[in-house]
């Protein structure tokens, strides 16, 4: 494994990961053991969903984020599938809607109650039937409302209008083998896919055409994945011919050679990439690994810059990633992962260390919000639009609320003589120290204290006398000036 050791300037160089305390984990969850390389976990600012083991069908758990600690075995699940659930994903435009794909060849879309489940949810809002083999991939369109993509082991990609349960597009001739994953581009005009035939394809779903293809993007036989980046480039993970895990960056305009190719190690778990378009950081989580590596993607060679590795003791069965709008910006949190162990889910917080308490504009540019940019019908008609952006500044809460304190000091508490006495009123100035001295005496009752107060009193009297004489001289000079004698 060879990472570049050249020190380069980056605000993400010191990003560090930290697991939360045990009482903030989700304990006693029976994570699914099904053989499939999906994340098994989906999370949004309201809910955490985890695919779990279930007898007699498929199920997944939906928990409010605040429901940490031990999860009772009788806690209600979403359990309408007749076969194991393989993939789940929250709708980006509605935090209460989640889609699931299953071995029973169906896609189901569910509406989760506002406060979470109080009883098992068996009735989906809509059932989408069109695949002839198990459905291993479901992914929502990033900007068009109610548009959902599903891909099955029948090598078919279907695109649905969930609002009408209508099949919009069927792409059944572009993939000759099992589809490992699918990823939309930023505005949802194209998607890329990774296939068992070792090819990465870029596809226009509305025309049903192949825009670009790279055969043998990674030469190894193990699963690979491909995701679109914000600038249109494609990031892939896979294996070399010698079964070493690899990362690569591709320019869709020229797929002949990768812009960058890095080898990581010789572990055999599939690498799951998670991309943050706001920071251009890619987090790579290996199934069965106990680490999360992260890289910054830039326009400068070598393009993929290794930042750091978060390592823990337990291997991960799956990982979910919180959308940017669900992070705590006041703590400089730039990513949060939900790591699945065999029996629990552990949040891991990625933080950029900053000294200032102020909102960090450079870490939090405007990000994709929950509002859809298009309706399904507009997208079908050929319109494209980027995500509707929101500012995270309103979510910022200062970590330290400082109270204003005004301190008024008694002139006698300072041992040094002060020239702050009022020169215009020398007569009443003398009794004031005497009263203060009397008060100090009654409180202190010590001879030393009395002597100190008397010294201060004498100094103040001398000061008052001096100021009085000075005022007299000034008045005398003023009189001569007015009389024209000066």
From Swiss-Prot:
Annotated protein name in UniProt: Coronin-1B
Cellular component terms per the entry's GO annotation: cytoplasm; stress fiber
Subunit structure: Forms homooligomers, but does not form complexes with the other coronins. Interacts with Arp2/3 complex components, including ACTR2, ARPC1B and ARPC2. Binds actin.
Composition-biased stretches (Low complexity): 432-444
Region (Disordered): 404-444
Stored SUPFAM superfamilies: WD40 repeat-like
Location relative to the cell: Cytoplasm, Cytoskeleton; Cytoplasm, Cytoskeleton, Stress fiber
Gene: CORO1B
Pfam families, alphabetized: DUF1899, WD40, WD40_4
Role played: Regulates leading edge dynamics and cell motility in fibroblasts. May be involved in cytokinesis and signal transduction.
Annotated organism of origin: Oryctolagus cuniculus
């Amino acid at each position: 494994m060879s990472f570049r050791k050249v020190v380069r300037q980056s605000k993400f160089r010191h990003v560090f990961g930290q697991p939360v305390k045990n009482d903030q984990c989700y304990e006693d969850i029976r994570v699914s053991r099904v053989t499939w390389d999906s994340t098994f976990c989906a999370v949004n600012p309201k809910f955490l969903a985890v695919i779990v083991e279930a007898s007699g069908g498929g199920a997944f758990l939906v928990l409010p984020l605040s429901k940490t600690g031990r999860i009772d075995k009788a806690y209600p699940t979403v359990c309408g599938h007749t076969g194991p659930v393989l993939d789940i994903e929250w709708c980006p435009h509605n935090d209460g809607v989640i889609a699931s794909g299953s071995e029973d060849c169906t896609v189901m879309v569910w509406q989760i109650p506002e406060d979470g489940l109080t009883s098992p949810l068996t009735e989906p809002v809509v059932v989408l039937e069109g695949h002839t083999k198990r459905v291993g991939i479901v992914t929502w369109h990033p900007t068009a409302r109610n548009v959902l993509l599903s891909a099955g082991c029948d090598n078919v990609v279907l695109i649905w209008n969930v609002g009408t349960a209508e099949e919009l597009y069927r792409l059944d001739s572009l993939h000759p083998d099992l589809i490992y994953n699918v990823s939309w581009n930023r505005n949802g005009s194209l998607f890329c896919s990774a296939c068992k035939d070792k090819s990465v394809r870029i596809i226009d779903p509305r025309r049903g055409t192949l825009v670009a293809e790279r055969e043998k993007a990674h030469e190894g036989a193990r699963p690979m994945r491909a995701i679109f980046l914000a600038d249109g480039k494609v990031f892939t993970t896979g294996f070399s011919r010698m079964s070493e895990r690899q990362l690569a960056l591709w320019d869709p305009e020229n797929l002949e050679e990768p812009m960058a190719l890095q080898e990581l190690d010789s572990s055999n778990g599939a690498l799951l990439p998670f991309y943050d378009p706001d920071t251009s950081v890619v987090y790579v989580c290996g199934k069965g690994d106990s680490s999360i590596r992260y890289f910054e993607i830039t326009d400068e060679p070598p393009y993929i810059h290794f930042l750091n590795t978060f390592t823990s003791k337990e291997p991960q069965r799956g990982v979910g990633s919180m959308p940017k709008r669900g992070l705590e910006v006041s703590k400089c949190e730039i990513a949060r992962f939900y790591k699945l162990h065999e029996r629990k889910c552990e949040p891991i917080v990625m933080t950029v260390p900053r000294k200032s308490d102020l909102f960090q504009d450079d870490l939090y540019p405007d990000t994709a919000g929950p509002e859809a940019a298009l309706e399904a019908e507009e997208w079908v008609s050929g319109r494209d639009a980027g995500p509707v952006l929101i500012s995270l500044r309103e979510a910022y809460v200062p970590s330290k609320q400082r109270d204003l304190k005004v301190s008024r000091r008694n002139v006698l508490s300072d041992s040094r003589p002060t020239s702050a006495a009022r020169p215009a009123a020398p007569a009443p100035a003398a009794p004031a120290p005497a009263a203060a001295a009397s008060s100090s005496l009654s409180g202190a009752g010590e001879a030393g204290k009395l002597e100190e107060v008397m010294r201060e009193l004498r100094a103040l009297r001398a000061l008052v006398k001096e100021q009085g004489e000075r005022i007299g001289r000034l008045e005398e000079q003023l009189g001569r000036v007015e009389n024209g004698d000066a």
